[in-house]
């Protein structure tokens, strides 16, 4: 009877749109440099934001000024963002030795929930880490280990009796890090409820076999949401059945004043921004759709060659793919033994394409 008139306030978690906005703004200078946002809110980020290119001449997440204005307006017009407090920003490690392209990990508090978010691939350090993730002898990588250490530290520091739920999220490599944490800590931490990964790549066979029990226990808590034309979520093997695709829209960004055009066009297709639709200058996540045929073909092909290539060929292949997006000091981030193709690699590679084409109906050599 004491509780007859008592109604517990049920607070809804952040929406998918709000999580995607957070993952988008992690690419901005305000999160990448310094600690000035710690103790402030996401709405404060909007007030302090200044549009600028990074040291390599990139837009933040390949989002141009016109597009970023819509991100700002979205944050301004939703009062939820003024209630999301930024507890911690870790940007102390960089993707290049000169300090550019920081690796960013952020902890946020909203009502009685903690959100731990991870930015996507940063510089040569993490592109090399992506290639190493494909090695059959790799169980987990240095970047995944560091993400787990950050999560553990934040969990210990901020998850007390007042916190009811914890969520992990990230875009691209950050999405993979958040999935990794859900697998490793999902059974141990009952408050860790969900992982929301955006365009996160998969895992190698060794990891999936070693952690098969943990994956089975936690895969229903992992959501991987990707753009229909995204080329990162197709890499390696996905560990969740909760894979959603949303319609992507991109104008490839503005190319004016750009130095790294190839990186920019690649980046524009993979940017978190492509998953938004706009109405009256305010952004929401776009409609659900199917994965594009081209990306489905790429996914099948990557799985085929990983299964059929020699170990040395596959290691070279993944380092070669990663190196496209390493913009400087390449020799530091590509092991010496994988800077040149193994003898006969291209002949074998063309044979793989031919054999894959025979196995898959309605796929042309040109598509591959």
Regions found by a protein language model. Name each.
Residues 169-174, 178:
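Gly/Ala-rich beta-loop-alpha elbow adjacent to hydrolase catalytic centers
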Residues 3-14, 22, 26-34, 40-76, ...:
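Alpha/beta hydrolase fold serine-hydrolase catalytic domain that processes acyl esters and thioesters
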Residues 178-187:
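Short glycine-enriched nucleophile-adjacent loop
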Residues 87:
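Active-site-adjacent helix-turn-beta-strand microarchitecture at beta-sheet edges
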């Amino acid at each position: 009877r004491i509780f007859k008139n008592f109604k517990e306030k049920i607070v809804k978690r952040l929406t998918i749109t709000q999580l995607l906005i957070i993952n988008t703004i992690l690419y901005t200078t305000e999160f990448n440099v310094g600690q000035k946002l710690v103790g402030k809110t996401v709405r404060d980020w909007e007030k302090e934001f200044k549009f600028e290119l990074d040291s390599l001449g990139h837009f933040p997440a390949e989002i141009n000024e016109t597009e970023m204005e819509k991100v700002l307006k979205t944050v301004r017009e939703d009062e939820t963002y003024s209630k999301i407090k930024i507890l911690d920003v870790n940007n102390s490690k960089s993707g290049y030795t000169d300090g550019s392209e920081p690796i960013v990990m952020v902890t946020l508090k909203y009502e009685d929930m903690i959100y731990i978010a991870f930015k996507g691939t940063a510089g040569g350090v993490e592109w090399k880490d992506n290639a190493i993730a494909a090695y059959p002898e790799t169980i987990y990588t240095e970047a995944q280990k560091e993400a787990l250490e950050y999560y553990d530290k934040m969990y210990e520091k901020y998850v007390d009796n007042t916190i009811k739920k914890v969520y992990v999220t990230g875009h691209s490599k950050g999405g993979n890090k958040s999935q990794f944490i859900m697998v490793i800590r999902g059974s141990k931490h009952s408050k860790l409820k969900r992982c929301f990964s955006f365009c996160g790549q998969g895992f190698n066979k060794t990891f999936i076999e070693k952690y098969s029990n943990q994956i089975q226990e936690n895969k229903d808590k992992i959501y991987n949401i990707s753009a229909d034309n995204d080329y990162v979520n197709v890499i390696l093997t996905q560990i969740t059945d909760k894979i959603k695709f949303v319609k992507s829209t991109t104008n490839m960004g503005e190319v004016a004043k750009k130095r790294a055009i190839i990186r920019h066009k690649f980046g524009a297709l993979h940017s978190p921004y492509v998953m938004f639709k706009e109405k009256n200058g305010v952004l929401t996540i776009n409609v659900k759709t199917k994965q594009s045929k081209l990306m489905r073909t790429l996914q099948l092909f990557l799985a085929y060659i990983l299964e059929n290539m020699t170990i040395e060929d596959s290691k070279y292949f993944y380092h070669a793919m990663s190196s496209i997006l390493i913009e400087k000091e390449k020799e530091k981030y590509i092991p010496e033994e994988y800077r040149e193709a193994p003898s006969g690699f291209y002949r074998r590679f063309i044979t793989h394409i031919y054999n894959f084409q025979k196995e898959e109906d309605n796929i042309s050599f040109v598509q591959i």
